């Protein structure tokens, strides 16, 4: 899920102002939240949140949130949140949420970007990510974190996030194995995949 605003996007405020009070973000213990708020002219705020959650059964209600807000002149706010949820067994309810909110609060010549990507896999047995998959995800995380220093234009930032999203999908499609299998060879778990939910 993507939310982007530039200067002059005050119309968004009327719809979303209540979603992100200045300086606050409500998060449950298993939520993944990136929040970037800037109120300094010419300033820049960047926040990146990354989470890999695993659970057996129960209620799958993890939330992945990217909140960005700016109230200044010539400033930038960028929030990026990536969350992977691996669920084994038979959950009683599957209702994850993915949310991207970008607020331009009477901001002149500013850019506000929120990017949220959530990946949920429900399988009938316990699985793990192979060593190769973990290395790939570690590189995805580092690549996304590096965007803070690179500070690319909005269009390039979006393409970078999309590219990393594709890499995560590839890992989840090819690098999940049964936890009982000592081999590092990926299992064909398609037959056991009960639910495949990606939001972003």
Name every feature range the model reports, one short phrase each.
Residues 1-12:
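Bacterial N-terminal signal peptides that target proteins for export
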Residues 11-20:
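Bacterial N-terminal signal peptides
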Residues 27-200:
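Low-complexity repeat regions of mature extracellularly deployed or surface/particle-associated proteins
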């Amino acid at each position: 899920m993507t939310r982007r605003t530039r200067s002059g996007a005050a119309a968004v405020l009327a719809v979303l102002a209540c979603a992100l009070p200045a300086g606050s973000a409500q998060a449950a213990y298993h939520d993944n939240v990136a929040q970037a708020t800037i109120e300094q002219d010419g300033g820049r705020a960047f926040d990146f949140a990354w989470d890999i959650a695993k659970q057996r059964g129960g209620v799958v209600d993890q939330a992945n949130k990217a909140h960005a807000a700016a109230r200044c002149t010539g400033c930038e706010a960028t929030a990026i949140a990536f969350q992977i949820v691996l669920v084994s067994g038979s959950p009683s309810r599957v209702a994850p949420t993915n949310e991207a909110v970008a607020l331009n609060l009477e901001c002149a010549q500013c850019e506000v970007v929120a990017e949220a990507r959530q990946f949920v896999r429900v399988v009938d047995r316990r699985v793990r990510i192979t060593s190769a998959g973990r290395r790939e995800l570690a590189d995805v995380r580092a690549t996304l974190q590096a965007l803070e220093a690179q500070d690319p234009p909005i269009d390039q930032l979006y393409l970078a996030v999309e590219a990393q999203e594709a890499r995560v999908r590839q890992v989840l499609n090819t690098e999940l194995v049964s936890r009982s299998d000592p081999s590092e060879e990926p299992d064909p778990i398609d037959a056991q995949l009960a639910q495949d939910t990606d939001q972003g």
